[in-house]
Amino acid sequence: MLKQAKKKGKPVIYHTHTTYEDFRGSIKGSYVLSPIIKFWTKKLYNEADYLISPSEYTKNLIKSKYLEKDKEIRVISNGVNINKFNKNEVLKEKFLNEYKLVYDINKPLIITAGLPFERKGIKDFVKVAQECSDYQFLWFGSSSVKSMLPDKIQKIIENPPKNLIFPGYVDKDILIGAFSAAKAFLFMTYEENEGIVVLEALSAKLPLVVRDIPVYEDWLEDGKTCFKARTNEEFCQKIRNIVENNVENLDEITETAYNIAVERDLLNIGKKYKEYYEHILNQKNR
């Protein structure tokens, strides 16, 4: 398809959402397969005329480790639907009614979402749940991949601590209800190209606790738009500060963070794509 497009004089654009770094620590054999992933992504990214990355971090990663010669890379966020991901009292009650027989809904709720990969920090998430045993933890994410996960991760999902539940994939209304009921969103990933669930948490004005990794350096600020941690002890402390109201300006932090989601609303992202595609076509017609 790439060669056919080039023969017809059509510009080829690739989205750099797949990287060697992002693939490791996912499914069974990912550490063995990741060099193959890097070989093919490197080949394809070099053959493309234009590249689009979801973050400055990914852009710099592609430039430094994948491209053989300099190439234009435009950064355009994955985006978030801010009209869908906002706190909703009706959906909150729906969620609590559905889960009141599953866990003690009087406990402070800490949530996360995403595929339960090792790279996503699932082992540390379990340790934090054990340390903060007076809180309830939920990890939302497709359970259909369970058989593809390493045995050690499958065992975690099958035998979690009493205060941790893996509901798997849930209806969007239930998920938004959980966002509305939770005290914090805990995202302990070790590697990310942006993190759509991060944008969803910001959009819902849910206090966000993330691992202090390079992808968040230039757009999430500790104590201003989120809370960053490096160790499990730090994660526990950040969560406790939020739950126990030991953060004086928490509302201000979530409001400032919400502005990031507004900037990355899908309507704005659509405009950016339109502008960039028009720019590419203008370049072609010169």
Label for each model-derived stretch:
Residues P11, D22-K43, N60:
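Nucleotide-sugar donor phosphate/pyrophosphate-binding loop at the beta->alpha transition
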Residues Y57, G79:
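Carbohydrate-associated surface elements
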Residues V102-K120, V126-Q130, L138:
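Conserved donor-binding/catalytic core segment of Leloir-type glycosyltransferases
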Residues Q136-N163, I174:
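Short, structured helix-loop element that forms part of the nucleotide-activated donor/catalytic region
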Residues Y169-V170, G177-A182:
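Short alpha-helical donor nucleotide-sugar binding micro-motif in glycosyltransferases
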Residues Y190:
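Aromatic "clamp/platform" in nucleotide-sugar-dependent glycosyltransferases that forms part
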Residues P207-V210:
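Short hydrophobic beta-strand element within catalytic cores of glycosyltransferases
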Residues D222-E233, N241-V247:
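Conserved acidic donor-binding segment of nucleotide-sugar-dependent glycosyltransferases
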